[in-house]
């Protein structure tokens, strides 16, 4: 998710160039680049979808140079977190009803990235054990 404005970080973060597109940590990468790199350790690059507002399409494509327009879930209006996650979930479900979704906000601080990756891998394994389909007829 990379659609918020980050108004608490004004004047660095603005509606035209919000915090996820800045190197807020002084690490040589913007927040969205760090998040994409972290998730790319878990998920093939082509399976990473970025939910953002239409106004940030060019910023995302400029900063995530290996990303294609097909990977962007462009929200026509900012409606906060829950609608963004629902939109992504519906998109994934329509492409793969058995797909597993990881929600990763682009502005989260992860202190121990190795532990974070291990925990996500464990969660993926748990989800794989839970996936099933049902042929049960409606009552």
Task: Give the label of every model feature segment.
Residues 4, 27, 138:
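Active-site beta-to-alpha loop of glycosyltransferases that engages the nucleotide-sugar donor
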Residues 8-11, 15, 26-105, 109-117, ...:
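Conserved N-terminal catalytic core of the sugar/cofactor nucleotidyltransferase
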Residues 127-131:
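A glycine-rich helix N-cap at a beta->alpha junction
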């Amino acid at each position: 998710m990379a659609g918020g404005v980050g108004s608490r970080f004004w004047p660095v973060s603005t509606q035209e160039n919000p915090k996820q597109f800045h190197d807020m940590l002084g690490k040589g990468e913007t927040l969205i680049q760090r998040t994409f790199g972290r998730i790319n350790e878990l998920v093939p690059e082509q399976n990473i979808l970025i939910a953002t507002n239409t106004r940030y399409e060019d910023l995302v494509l400029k900063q995530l140079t290996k990303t294609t327009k097909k990977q962007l879930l462009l929200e026509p209006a900012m409606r906060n977190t829950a609608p963004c996650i629902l939109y992504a979930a519906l998109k994934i479900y329509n492409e793969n009803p058995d797909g597993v979704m990881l929600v990763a906000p682009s502005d989260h601080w992860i202190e121990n990235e190795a532990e974070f990756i291990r925990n996500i891998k464990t969660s993926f394994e748990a989800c794989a054990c839970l996936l099933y389909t049902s042929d049960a007829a409606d009552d």
